[in-house]
Amino acid sequence: MKFSSLYCFLLLLIFQTDFGQNEETSRRQRRKMYHRRLRKSSLSTHRSVRQPGIQQMKTVTPAAKLPIINLDYSIEENFESFLSVPGVESSYNVLPGKKGHCLANGMIMYNKAVWSPEPCTTCLCLNGKVLCDETKCHPQMCPQTIIPEGECCPVCSNTEQREPTNLPHKQQSPPWEEMNRALRKEELQLEEDEEEVKQDENREQKKKTFRPGDWGRPINEGQSREGKAQRPEEEGRQAHQHRNPARENEEDDDEEEEDDDDEEEDDDDEDETIRGDTFRMPPRLPIPATPRGIPSLPSMCSLSYKTISCISADLTQIPPLTAPEITSLELIDNSITSIPDEAFNGLPNLERLDLSKNNITSSGIGPKAFKFLKNLMRLNMDGNNLVTIPSELPSTLEELKINENKLQVIDEESLSDLNQLVTLELEGNNLSETNVNSLAFKPLKSLSYLRLGRNKFRIIPQGLPASIEELYLENNQIEEITEISFNHTRKINVIGLRYNKIEENRIAPLAWINQENLESIDLSYNKLYHVPSYLPKSLVHLVLIGNQIERIPGYVFGHMEPGLEYLYLSFNKLVDDGIDRVSFYGAYHSLRELFLDHNELKSIPPGVQEMKALHFLRLNNNKIRNILPEQICNAEEDDDSNLQHLHLENNYIKTREIPSYAFSCIRSYSSIVLKPQNIK
């Protein structure tokens, strides 16, 4: 009895399993046949409309180089300073800026300035340190991602965004469960479509049935109406076939190929029936193909985070682009010669435009080429052939660069309406006091950074705006500084006058002594024979490298408050008689760096041991032969010196004859450089 019951139960189980598989197979076949009918009907009645546009490349989020951002979002700074990192020394080619400024990409950033060197990266200048932060993006588990406008991180392009796998509170479902959910959703959609088709068929049948009021109408009346409605469609179809017979043949071939593919898929499905004792991984979800008919960017161009870059792309004209979402356009190092009025009509929201290293001429720029760029803030036209500043520049400009051109004149109207301009760079042109109008800079109410280096000025340009804070006039022919040179520039903080022809007796006593904000002056490579007198009392940095200076007059720094901190006198002709104990009077308490290398000193200058704040001392490449006791360390004092770097190499010192306590106040002997020495 038990055996017969068990046998019947097994037969019933086998029958149920076979019936379930057959039911599933028939359901899948019906679904595919239905989708095939829908696809054929859509191919026969609808044709895709191609729309022009721009094919975007996949956005690549650049990784910030500095600083290092840990997993807990803490920041590790890489702050290069010889005052805090052993072995790093000052550079002669760096002009110290205002205390708290930062140097980034060749530009001096103000304290608390914020900028974005790369997409998704934000940097902050804080008390001389550059702090950068990068937006971290979680990976998306979807076939295609997009970056929404104004965002850094990609999101899924479909409506259902999958959860990231790295979230701890949610566990990713197995792939077969995802496939089952997709199949269930597809079945529900299929049932809804079938219901709609049935409803449409019922409506058509109701229309064809005669109502009681229709018996008196002729039957051919409805036929004639249908014929009239179908006649234009038939005529249009015949005309289309007559014009494009080849295209019709291609479409028929495509439909036949699709039918063959569907049949092959049906055969494969029949062979790959899922059995109860086997497991088969579900196929990959289809990835949508790129729409056909969308034109791509010009060759050698790229699109990344609202920026179009065409660097060294062999362009001879500005490409016609229509993309209102683009905010930055780079056309660097091409062969563009002209800018027509309508060049940027398709880019109305441009904020940054870089046209450097081209062959653009002033005559090739339309009078309204830039007028309608209402959001433009940064314009770079370095390395072109401009002889005048372009007209009708937008009033929103904050930065204008026209370096390395052929500018020959700046009149009163050249910079009109640029009242928001902060940075102006006009280096490497043919400008002088004869072709620059004294009222040219008057409209620039917000200008704080002005570069006029590598021109032909013989005096300081007149009419500088009162808002100016940094002025650079390197590589000109300036010979004197008069009392009225900086009369109206009370906010000026940095003056760079390297490589000119200035002599100390051509600097007027009242030229800058009353400036209250002037902290940095660079007079390197001029014709100075001693340290200039009447320096600003607010001075902090003084750079006098590469002159003919033979002495430092006494009390020359005595009037300064709070006091000089950085003094660079390298590559001069200083001798022992040119420095005495009162030469550094007024700077003993404040001097942090003193560079006296590459001179003709035979001994360590007096007063070094009294410089309590000194961190960096260079005396290398002189003619020093011995180090006397108490020239660097005072034996009567027990406190350690703040000196962290002492350079005495390339002199004539006999290291074995140095007194044992000569460097006793220095905390680490590794900070003293004594070798190599000259032998003579």
From Swiss-Prot:
Q: Where is this motif: Cell attachment site?
A: 275-277
Q: Which SMART domains match?
A: LRR_BAC, LRR_TYP, VWC
LRR repeats located where?
Answer: 349-369, 375-396, 397-417, 420-440, 446-466, 467-488, 491-511, 517-538, 539-559, 563-583, 590-611, 613-634, 642-665
The Swiss-Prot or TrEMBL record describes its family as follows: Belongs to the small leucine-rich proteoglycan (SLRP) family. SLRP class I subfamily.
Which residues belong to any copy of the LRRNT domain?
288-325
* Classification via Gene3D superfamilies: 6.20.200.20, Ribonuclease Inhibitor
- Locations of Acidic residues compositional bias? 189-198, 249-272
Name the species this protein comes from: Bos taurus (Bovine)
Protein name stated in the entry: Extracellular matrix protein 2
